[in-house]
From Swiss-Prot:
Amino acid composition bias (Polar residues), ranges on this chain: 80-94
Native source species: Homo sapiens
Positions with biased composition (Basic and acidic residues): 55-66
Biased composition (Low complexity): 43-54
Disordered: annotated segments: 1-105
Protein name: Putative uncharacterized protein FLJ44636
Length: 123
């Protein structure tokens, strides 16, 4: 029995390894181990692919920072963009854009359709 004021038995919990941040290692991508690493580094520095590998590493860091930030709200939904787009407004009002039950060409009187066709062929 321990005396009062003295520490009791020390219990140690098994330590779990802390997860390492995900980084891109040039040795993995180039397929080279420790052998010839100086040559690989100089080759990476002189080539354009070296810049892209560095960019990949930067993107990984930046992406992890973005995941921590709350997502920004989208400015507008896709349906709203379609209703305000002049192209969609044009196709919704032009005759023939919809099937006959929705006001297409067949819903117009036959003489109007013929007149439009005649004007189009005269040009």
């Amino acid at each position: 029995m321990p005396l009062p004021g003295t520490p009791g038995p020390v219990t140690t919990s098994p330590q779990t390894p802390t997860p390492r941040p995900l980084t891109t290692d040039w040795r993995i991508l180039s397929g080279k181990g420790s052998g010839g690493s100086a040559r690989a580094v100089s080759k990476l520095r002189s080539s354009s692919s070296g810049n892209s590998l560095l960019r990949i590493r930067d993107l990984g860091v930046r992406k992890s920072q973005e995941e921590a930030a709350p997502p920004s709200p989208r400015p507008q939904s896709r349906a709203h963009a379609q209703t305000t787009n002049p192209y969609w407004a044009d196709t919704n009002t032009r005759p023939g854009a919809h099937p006959p039950e929705h006001g297409g060409v067949a819903a117009l009187p036959a003489q109007v359709v013929g007149q439009c066709h005649q004007e189009a062929t005269e040009d």
